[in-house]
A protein has these predicted regions:
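Acidic, small-polar-rich N-terminal luminal/periplasmic segments of exported/outer-membrane proteins
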Residues: 40-173, 536
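Repeated loop/turn-to-beta-strand initiation elements of outer-membrane beta-barrel proteins
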Residues: 201-204, 238-241, 301-304, 360, ...
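Structural signature of Gram-negative outer-membrane beta-barrels, strongest in the C-terminal barrel
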Residues: 234, 343, 362-366, 370-374, ...
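Membrane-embedded beta-barrel scaffold of Gram-negative outer-membrane proteins
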Residues: 295-309, 313-319, 493, 500-501, ...
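Gram-negative outer-membrane beta-barrel transporters
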Residues: 451, 551-556, 571-653, 686, ...
Length: 716
């Protein structure tokens, strides 16, 4: 690992020194960002040290970033385009303290400070917990907040959350933006952004995208369609209404990676083999989401907002994947299943934000509530191999030679012993209907005791009520969890551009899990998992436009488990994750934008009797990323980046290892005119073979080799 980091860091350092020599005086990226923000209206933007909005956002109040006692990172739409990001996973790679999990080839999955999540996603501050791949076509920016914090986000958020801020109508303007790109794998996309001023006080904005998917793996293809019309109306100076509808339609091949070998590392010889059925490894996802927000200023010191969101989601995925590999015989064990989810979500949330003073002490008080009503129907059918049944073995596993391609297609395969097998998804494993109702109320006070001292104190009450019907046997199980989650923060400000803070926050996850598919015994008798975050950090605005942040933290998970048939006998399984994060981001000079992040993570699993000696899975000890934008001339810009991770374990038993890696990326962009830009992004410049993430020890993702993306963007 040391050699990989040293080699990559040396290359990057040399290039970082060399590129500025090309630079000439040019308009700054900060100016460009501010100009773009002005054109796109009052969205959540970064201007100096303030994250502000007259809309709901992840922080729920207009709070200077420097005064937030929690680690957070923001990726703007401009950064998304310049760095060539085309997925949430790309953004995560360049964010400290977080990394990607595999998501079984059918969903986003982020590891926040060592805690894996497929549900801690939000859109404009509203929960978006269905499992799918989220697009970037309609975003102003992406916010990643780290550390458990149920006060603002409710259940989950056990290691952090990711919030997408969408584009809204811009009153008084007419414009059309577009993007088209194609990469060396053959994938391409087309984005459109159209804003129409429908009156002096209203605007209609339509964002749409079509993406044709392809990559370096056999059989992979797919498409993504997104359409998001939004309407904004300003009803006088004090009231704004935003309405939106989003239609999402995804279809893609499911690739769950390759197995590990006898040495516990991914089998490099399998880098081109897809262990699945080209006709049956498939996921589809359709969503219809309606959202409306009303914001009103009752006075200069009291504002309120109310959001209603309704979503209808339909997802299915079928897949075959490896569960084991025998190096002596070159034989893999193949398992499979098909899973469907039909979900409807209603979310109502509201906040009152007041600013007032009591006895010379200033307050920013947030009072809020949330109601969630969810119905979820989930079923799973396991694969049945007729040869396994005939042999009297487990029906959903068979053994194939590790060949390219795997001898399985259309449900018919040739086994390692030469026999023909037929497989169908016919064994019912689960069929549940869940109804979930959540009532929440929260209160937070940001107290300014003096110019140099601020305190944040608050708490949230959640009542989580779930009923699950098991259609296999008609059993109905219910559970209600009432939880209070506190948040405390202390901020010292020796000077206006410097904050030193400490904070404590909690969150919880009911035993029905992130996707609440069941509460079968013994889970119906167990309390929720609880998570706490103790953090201390510093935020320093070195000068306007350049900020340095750092934090040390400890996350503790408490997960009660039944150790035998008696639910009264529990074995409490804990994990403790300690770490350090640092980030430097902003305009170093008028021609150099820098975003750099580092994290150190150390996590151990614990039982009731103490530490087990095992490390938490998917927890690289060291992670580092850096991205530079250099404005070489008035029209030419260059980008250079590095993302690197230490080795980590793919499983909790610490038997499978993901090797360390370092990947270097490049970019060049040229402004053909004031309204048209062409650019090229090169990923994995030195064609490193790497394995960035996994789902289990036998499902390891193969990183993409050297590739390039060519993009044209414009606006008129």
């Amino acid at each position: 690992m040391i050699h990989s980091f040293a080699r990559a860091s040396l290359l990057l350092s040399c290039a970082t020194i060399a590129f500025p020599a090309l630079a000439e005086t040019a308009p700054t990226a900060a100016a460009s960002t501010e100009s773009a923000a002005a054109e796109s209206g009052p969205q959540i933007i970064v201007t100096g040290d303030v994250l502000y909005s007259n809309q709901i956002n992840a922080l729920k109040s207009p709070t200077p970033i420097i005064d937030v006692p929690q680690s957070l990172s923001i990726t703007t739409a401009d950064q998304i385009v310049r760095q060539g990001f085309d997925s949430i996973g790309d953004i995560v790679l360049y964010t400290p303290g977080v990394t990607n999990s595999q998501g079984e080839g059918n969903r986003d999955s982020v590891v926040f400070r060592g805690v894996r999540s497929t549900a801690d996603f939000f859109v404009d501050g509203v929960r978006d917990d269905v499992q799918y791949y989220r697009g970037l076509y309609n975003l102003e920016q992406v916010e990643i907040l780290r550390g458990p914090n149920a006060l603002l986000f409710g259940r989950g958020g056990t290691g952090g959350i990711l919030n997408r801020v969408t584009k809204k109508g811009v009153v008084g303007e007419n414009f059309v933006g577009y993007r088209g790109s194609v990469d060396t794998f053959g994938a391409f996309d087309i984005w459109a952004d159209v804003n129409l001023a429908t009156s002096e006080n209203s605007a209609l904005r339509i964002n749409a995208a079509y993406e044709d998917l392809n990559n370096h793996r056999d059989f992979f293809d797919g498409e993504q369609i997104g359409i998001n019309p939004t309407f904004r109306a300003e009803l006088g100076a004090a009231t704004t209404i935003d309405l939106s509808y989003e239609y999402v339609d995804h279809e893609r091949f499911v690739d769950r990676g390759i197995p590990t070998g006898a040495d516990g590392t991914p089998v490099r010889a399998f880098k081109r083999i897809t262990f699945g059925d080209p006709d049956n490894n498939l996921t589809t996802f359709t969503a219809h989401v309606l959202r409306g927000t009303v914001q009103h200023a009752f006075s200069d010191s009291l504002k309120g907002n109310l959001t209603a969101s309704w979503g209808d989601y339909d997802k299915a995925y079928s897949n075959f994947f490896t569960t084991g590999f025998d190096p002596a015989t070159n034989v893999v064990a193949i398992d499979g299943y098909v899973d469907t989810t039909r979900r409807k979500n209603l979310v109502l949330s509201g906040n009152l934000i007041g600013e007032f003073a009591t006895g010379g002490i200033n307050h920013v008080l947030i009072v809020g509530g949330e109601f969630i009503d969810t119905s979820n129907n989930n079923d799973r059918f396991n694969a049945v191999f007729d040869t396994a049944v005939a042999d009297g073995r487990r029906a959903d596993v068979e053994f194939f030679a590790a060949t390219r391609p795997l001898a399985l297609r259309g449900g018919v395969g040739t086994l390692a012993d030469g026999r023909t097998t037929n497989v169908a998804f016919s064994a019912l494993n689960d069929d549940t209907e869940a109804d979930l109702t959540i009532f929440s109320a929260y209160l937070q006070d940001e107290i300014k005791l003096a110019e140099w001292l601020r305190v944040v104190v608050g708490a949230r009450f959640d009542s989580f009520d779930i009923t699950v019907l098991d259609n296999r046997n008609g059993a109905v199980r219910t559970r209600t969890d009432d939880k209070v989650s506190p948040r405390l923060g202390l901020i010292l400000k020796p000077q206006p551009n410097l904050s030193i803070y400490t904070s404590y926050s909690e969150s919880f996850l009911p035993r029905s899990g992130e996707q609440f598919s069941d509460i079968n015994p013994p889970n119906d008798a167990l309390d929720p998992d609880t998570f706490s975050n103790l953090e201390a950090g510093v935020k320093w605005d070195i000068y306007p436009g350049l900020a340095l942040t750092g934090a040390v933290f400890e996350i503790e998970q408490n997960s009660p488990q039944v150790s035998d048939a008696n639910p009264d006998t529990l074995d409490v399984i804990n994990s403790k994750i300690r770490g350090f994060e640092a980030q430097l981001q902003g305009q170093v000079t008028d021609w150099w934008f820098l975003s750099a992040g580092y994290s150190y993570l150390d996590g151990k699993q614990q039982s009731r009797t103490g530490p087990t000696g095992l490390r938490v899975r998917e927890l690289p000890e060291h992670m580092f990323s850096i991205w530079n934008n250099f404005q070489a001339t008035d029209r030419l810009g260059l980008g250079l980046g590095l993302t690197a991770q230490d080795d980590s374990f793919a499983d909790n038993s610490n038997t499978a290892t993901l090797p360390s890696y370092a990947r270097i990326d490049l970019a060049a962009f040229y402004d053909v005119s004031d309204n048209v830009r062409v650019q090229v992004n090169v990923e994995n410049l030195f064609d490193e073979l790497y394995f960035p993430n996994a789902h289990t020890a036998n499902e390891v993702t193969v990183g993409a080799p050297l590739n390039a993306r060519f993009t044209i963007t414009g606006r008129f």
